[in-house]
Amino acid sequence: MNYFPWLTIIVVFPIFAGSLIFFLPHKGNRVIRWYTICICILELLLTTYAFCYHFQLDDPLIQLVEDYKWIDFFDFHWRLGIDGLSIGPILLTGFITTLATLAAWPITRDSRLFHFIMLAMYSGQIGSFSSRDLLLFFIMWELELIPVYLLLAMWGGKKRLYSATKFILYTAGGSVFLLMGVLGVALYGSNEPTLNFETLVNQSYPVVLEIIFYIGFFIAFAVKLPIIPLHTWLPDTHGEAHYSTCMLLAGILLKMGAYGLIRINMELLPHAHSIFSPWLMIIGTIQIIYAASTSLGQRNLKKRIAYSSVSHMGFIIIGISSLTDTGLNGALLQIISHGFIGAALFFLAGTTYDRIRLVYLDEMGGIAIPMPKMFTMFSSFSMASLALPGMSGFVAELIVFFGIITGQKYVLIPKILITFVMAIGMILTPIYSLSMSRQMFYGYKLFNAPKDSFFDSGPRELFLSISIFLPVIGIGIYPDFVLSLAVDKVEVILSNFFYR
């Protein structure tokens, strides 16, 4: 038991500091921006310090545990703790949120509310990744919905109300299933509700009941991840959201769905997961092909990148359903890798739109010459997205491939088929991402346009892009840095499938 409440401070600090924004003096937006960025940096440093000095990597058990009784009536605790599974997403959250706050620099309308919402989301995300109580996990999960809805509805594009409503309907619908699953698991087989993760891991259920719980949780996480056919909110949301919101959506929000699948569906309901994993494998494979093909037909730049995100999530689903150490490690690496690459692509798409005010690819063209820095950065991240060797996406997808091939659960012919179909998906990825670069940057369309609005990336944009590019290259060259965080925890999770 750790006596200093590190995790409580890390979870509560952003939303508490964010609420002080409303009391800052009215001296323009600059004060609010700098205040928010300082809070984000301070939070990231605090998190890094707590993890470096108080977290043992070789211990697969829950660490930094905090447990305070909250509501006595139904045994609800403020229970936090982290392990190898949650440390990567928490650090990714801190990094991407700090950069998204910097990306939101041009926003001037209702600046106080905007920055408060960003910090409230920060708390909700870290709370979701560090909860060790099912009801607390649900509350933190819900803390995400309203901020994203407001960010969409207030600072989005022309169709912002449509996409915000679609987002809230999908995610709130998923949350109903999540709540039903939480209540079902908590109330099963005892007079007192049990919400503690540690107790629930050792709980066993009748097969039919476990399958019902599994489906409830699965629908909630499938909406957030997203898994086809529950993905249609994502392209609309990305198409209308401000690019700083897109960074948070692509970098962190989708990863919460993947985290929930591993943390709850795999860890708490292993029998049902082993029954469903062949179907998940098929869904993941279809998703890679379907989303890559659909992406190719999109005129809207942001929607094309959104469909590429859906395609990349297919690798995470396949890694989770492979039931091997290698596959699950690959899925966790893909979670981190796509968090960086997706956020960077949306940021660059948004800054390009700020300059040329065009969103359809067939209207663009020829901007590589007036904007060479933008061209270089966008091309680099497109290469990272199509899994170029030496970048993080390549390592993650390769490890997922190995996970399928070495898996004991599946016979040879399905493994060969799935690997073959995944390979087709990986061939489609360069087609849509390179054609996107070609339509934007090559040709002569905009070359004759007036040069006033065509200024290249400024120091803020360069700093942001390089800050994301360094981890992408770093993980690509030395993936052990990320893999070592979770490798012991992955073994513990998978031991449930073979020794239970």
UniProtKB/Swiss-Prot annotation:
GO terms for cellular component: chloroplast thylakoid membrane. It is found in: Plastid, Chloroplast thylakoid membrane. This is NAD(P)H-quinone oxidoreductase chain 4, chloroplastic. Its EC number is 7.1.1.-. Belongs to the complex I subunit 4 family. InterPro entries: NADH_Q_OxRdtase_chain4, NADH_Q_OxRdtase_chainM/4, NADH_UbQ_OxRdtase, ND/Mrp_TM. It comes from Atropa belladonna. It comes from the Eukaryota. GO terms for molecular function: NADH dehydrogenase (ubiquinone) activity; ubiquinone binding. It is an enzyme of class 7 (translocase).
